[in-house]
């Protein structure tokens, strides 16, 4: 395992990952975060350098980490299952309860196999596809039929966001607070200043947790918020993406109409201790 630290190496890797889109989109987003300010203390490792076949961008809790309250997350890009297996069994990767993996669906079995060998089981959430917008020219804004104001979330809104997630708990509260505190987000507020629609971004530059309260739907709020965030990200020279479940026909239609194209199937894996 080689951990890339030098700016020239990370910049070179960025150019290589661009050539591997759409398969590399999440790792590329994490690399962009590292090159910007790396608030989330991400690391980038590869199987070899200056050429590589597998790259893992990850946040690993260590002594002195500012984000110990957030589950460790690993985003994987690989063109070779043998090199992927080698990286995942490297001693520098500390397998423990709560690890999260984001990986192309056809690589998920390797993660499950190694987790089992290490005495863990894996909870799987699959069936997601990346939807990517590569340039401002391909960005189509949906019509907004509301006069409500646009604003940004603050940490006091974290519980409101988590209430609308299909999963929750203290881990998600901490994660959402960190996203709101450190990363771009947008929301629409009602006449009293309360958020009624919002979109967040994560450390891999993925649009996440989009939600609109029922009485405010069908007014173009989420589309408008996504458009604003996408413009910002693309202006930074980065393709913008989100992950949508294959059964979410409404979101797929919305993103397709906005100029996003479908990428690869993604599976999320959560490592759990046995027993």
Question: What is the role of each PLM region?
Answer:
Residues 1-27, 128, 134-172:
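Short amphipathic alpha-helix that is part of the acyltransferase structural core
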Residues 168-215:
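A conserved beta-strand-loop-helix scaffold within acyl/acetyltransferase catalytic domains
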Residues 41-42, 48-148, 269-271:
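Acyl-donor-binding surface of acyltransferase catalytic domains
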Residues 207, 240-244:
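Conserved hydrophobic beta-strand within the GNAT/NAT acetyltransferase core sheet
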Residues 107-121, 246-264:
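Conserved active-site alpha-helix within GNAT-family acetyltransferase domains
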Residues 81-90, 218-234, 252-257:
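Conserved acetyl-CoA-binding loop-helix of GNAT-fold acetyltransferases
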Residues 41-58, 181-197:
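Conserved beta-hairpin
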Residues 264-275:
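C-terminal helix/juxtamembrane-tail motif
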């Amino acid at each position: 395992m080689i951990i890339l630290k030098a700016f020239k190496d990370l910049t070179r890797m960025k150019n290589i990952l661009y050539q591997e889109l759409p398969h590399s989109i999440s790792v590329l987003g994490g690399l962009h975060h590292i090159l910007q300010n790396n608030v989330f203390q991400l690391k980038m490792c590869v199987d070899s350098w200056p050429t590589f076949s597998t790259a893992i961008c990850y946040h690993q809790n260590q002594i002195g980490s500012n984000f110990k309250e957030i589950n460790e997350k690993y985003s994987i890009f690989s063109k070779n299952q043998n090199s992927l297996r080698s990286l995942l069994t490297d001693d520098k990767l500390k397998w423990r309860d709560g690890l999260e993996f984001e990986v192309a669906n056809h690589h998920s079995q390797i993660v499950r196999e190694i987790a089992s060998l290490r005495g863990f089981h894996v909870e799987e959430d699959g069936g997601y596809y990346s939807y990517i917008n590569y340039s401002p020219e391909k960005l189509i804004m949906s019509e907004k039929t509301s006069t409500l104001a646009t604003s940004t979330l603050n940490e006091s809104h974290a519980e409101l966001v988590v209430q609308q997630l299909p999963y929750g708990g203290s881990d998600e509260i901490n994660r959402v607070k960190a996203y709101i505190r450190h990363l771009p987000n947008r929301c629409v507020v009602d006449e009293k200043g309360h958020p009624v629609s919002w979109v967040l971004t994560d450390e891999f530059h993925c649009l996440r947790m989009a939600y609109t309260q029922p009485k405010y739907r069908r007014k173009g709020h989420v589309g408008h918020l996504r458009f604003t965030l996408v413009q910002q990200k693309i202006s930074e020279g980065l393709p913008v993406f989100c992950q949508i479940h294959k059964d979410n026909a409404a979101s797929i239609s919305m993103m397709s109409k906005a100029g996003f194209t479908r990428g690869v199937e993604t599976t999320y894996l959560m490592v759990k201790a046995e027993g």
